[in-house]
């Protein structure tokens, strides 16, 4: 039972990070901003 819960949690995490479906627009907007600011890009990478 614990494994099932773990799998579901992991799947949700992977979907949010790996699946660029919903977070696609956000990532795009962030990417553009990051591209404009090289320093911010480094910070974002560290934050992630």
From Swiss-Prot:
Disulfide bonds: none annotated. It holds the Pfam family SspP. Its main location: other. It is found in: Spore core. Residues 1-48 are annotated as: Disordered. Induction: Expressed only in the forespore compartment of sporulating cells. Keywords: Sporulation. InterPro entries: SASP_SspP (IPR012614). Residues 31-48 have a biased composition (Basic residues). One of its GO terms (biological process) is sporulation resulting in formation of a cellular spore. Belongs to the SspP family. HAMAP family: SspP. This is Small, acid-soluble spore protein P. It comes from Geobacillus thermodenitrificans (strain NG80-2). The lineage of its organism: Bacteria, Bacillati, Bacillota, Bacilli, Bacillales.
């Amino acid at each position: 039972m614990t494994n099932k819960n773990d799998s579901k949690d992991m799947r949700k995490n992977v979907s949010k990070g790996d699946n660029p479906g919903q977070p696609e627009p956000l990532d795009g907007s962030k990417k553009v901003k990051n591209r404009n600011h090289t320093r911010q890009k480094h910070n974002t990478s560290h934050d992630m």
